[in-house]
């Protein structure tokens, strides 16, 4: 496991499936999530807390893409494994839309472009429906970005770098 990374089950489950010799679907519930009011998944985040939380999903997209690359010569990488990367990237896009603070929104958009998640969003599309959503979001992000400064400069200011 990666220390400090939220939602590690996403990456863990994917790697588990890559290493499984056989897989079978069952209706039986093997475990239950207990979501309480103070759960990490249910917290309403705004501003820097939201930005930091979305960085986890950006990192998850990077890790999933790395897994797909590492296992490409060992197993068949089905379209669903690629599309999972796009789904996680779309989560970040929806968080951008919901962010009320305009400065934080610009930082999130800048990190999407700087981290390469923008490319992962598009290159891992494997269906028409998700392709439409990815193109729509890439157009929105391109329109919403801060056009007065480069995305690298905005990201550096998010990390308080000179």
Where are these regions (language model features)?
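Conserved nucleotide-sugar donor-binding catalytic segment
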Residues: 1-46
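Active-site catalytic microenvironments for nucleophilic, acid-base chemistry
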Residues: 19, 67, 81, 95
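Alpha-helical structural elements of signaling/regulatory helical domains
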Residues: 21, 25, 73-74, 100-101
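Catalytic core of nucleotide-sugar-dependent glycosyltransferases
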Residues: 30-37, 43-72, 91, 98-118
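Short, charged, amphipathic alpha-helical segments
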Residues: 76-83, 106-107
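Amphipathic alpha-helical repeat scaffolds of TPR domains
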Residues: 80-94
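Membrane-interface aromatic/basic loop that binds lipid-linked glycans or pyrophosphate carriers
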Residues: 95-162
């Amino acid at each position: 496991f990666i220390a400090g990374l939220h939602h590690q089950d996403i990456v863990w489950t994917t790697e588990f499936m890559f290493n499984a010799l056989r897989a079978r679907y069952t209706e039986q519930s093997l475990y239950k999530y207990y979501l309480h009011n103070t759960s990490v998944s249910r917290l309403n985040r705004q501003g820097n807390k939201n930005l930091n939380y979305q960085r986890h999903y950006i990192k998850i997209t990077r890790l999933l893409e790395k897994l797909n690359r590492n296992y490409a010569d060992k197993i068949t990488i089905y379209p669903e494994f690629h599309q999972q990367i796009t789904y996680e990237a779309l989560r970040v896009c929806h968080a951008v839309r919901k962010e009320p603070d305009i400065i934080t929104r610009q930082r999130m958009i800048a990190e999407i472009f700087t981290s390469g998640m923008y490319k992962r969003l598009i290159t891992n599309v494997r269906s028409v429906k998700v392709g439409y959503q990815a193109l729509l979001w890439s157009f929105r992000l391109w329109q919403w970005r801060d056009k007065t400064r480069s995305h690298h400069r905005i990201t550096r200011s998010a990390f308080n770098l000179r």
